[in-house]
């Protein structure tokens, strides 16, 4: 990789360091088939973008509970959705951060596929090999089918995560996506099995770290190669091997980038400890107000 190009990337203020390494450099170096960036959350100032959108739609959202007639309610929801999507176009897709991500994707010879998760949350998948697109698009299409099925006939027994992300409980889908994203086979299989059994993967991974620390074991951060990745166990040899290989290649590219990645790996382990708390905070926004008042 051209040193001047790398220096420019590292100085880019509109792309977060984690995105530079995990989402751009790893696919560019052929170390990951596909990477994923959630926007605007993984943009510098992403939270502020979301707040600006929310502020614009808040007056309309506040009126929704007062609309009781079914046809009027449906129309009000559609208007709200349109407002959210227009807000995303203006504040996210019109931002320097968005333009910088796509500019760097092009400059590094990478390709991308953008997928809407919610009106104000999109995922950008980044890859080098053109042949990957077919598998990726097929997976995203299957995800849409699973979500439409759940939304068309909601099951009152489903929890918040099952309703919002039904694909997370479809083992075959998880395994296909996990392999595309470069996760070790053993960790993908454990994740899929846990989800199918109703095990809270985030809590399981956090508890594994806590129990290891209680038992006097030293935590091996090298088992956590990526953010929001949950290894099958805290000392997983396969995920540790991934970190060792990736860090070696990044150090060969530039010692500073290798050191940056080392810091990220340590932060990944800490984020696993916090993940159950973060998910609960996210899901709480979907709770009916009367449930919140009881807590």
Locate the predicted segments by residue.
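An amphipathic, hydrophobic-aromatic interaction surface with interspersed Lys/Arg
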Residues: 171-178
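A conserved ligand/cofactor-binding region detector
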Residues: 1-165, 176, 183-295
């Amino acid at each position: 990789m051209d040193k001047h190009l790398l220096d420019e990337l590292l100085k880019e203020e509109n792309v977060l360091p984690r995105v530079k390494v995990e989402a751009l450099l790893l696919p560019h170096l052929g170390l990951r088939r596909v990477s994923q960036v959630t926007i605007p959350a993984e943009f510098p100032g992403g939270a502020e973008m979301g707040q600006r959108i929310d502020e614009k739609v808040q007056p309309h959202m506040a009126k929704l509970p007062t609309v009781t007639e079914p046809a009027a309610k449906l129309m009000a929801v559609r208007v709200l959705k349109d407002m959210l999507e227009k807000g995303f176009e203006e504040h996210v897709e019109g931002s320097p951060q968005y333009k910088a991500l796509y500019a760097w994707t092009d400059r590094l010879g990478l390709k991308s596929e953008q997928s809407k998760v919610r009106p104000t949350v999109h995922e950008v998948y980044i890859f080098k090999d053109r042949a990957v697109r077919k598998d990726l698009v097929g997976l995203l299409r299957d995800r849409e089918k699973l979500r439409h099925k759940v939304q068309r006939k909601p099951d009152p027994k489903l929890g918040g995560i099952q309703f919002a992300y039904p694909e997370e409980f479809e083992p075959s889908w998880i395994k296909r996506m996990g392999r595309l994203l470069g996760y070790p086979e053993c960790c993908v299989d454990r994740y899929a099995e846990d989800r199918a059994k109703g095990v809270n993967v985030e809590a399981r991974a956090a508890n594994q770290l806590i129990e290891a620390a209680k038992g006097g074991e030293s935590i091996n951060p090298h088992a956590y190669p990526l953010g929001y990745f949950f290894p099958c166990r805290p000392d997983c040899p396969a995920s540790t091997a991934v970190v060792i290989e990736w860090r070696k290649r990044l150090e060969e590219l530039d010692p500073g980038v290798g050191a940056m990645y080392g810091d990220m790996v340590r932060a990944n382990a800490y984020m696993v400890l916090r993940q159950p708390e973060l998910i609960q905070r996210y899901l709480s926004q979907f709770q009916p107000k009367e449930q919140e008042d009881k807590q």
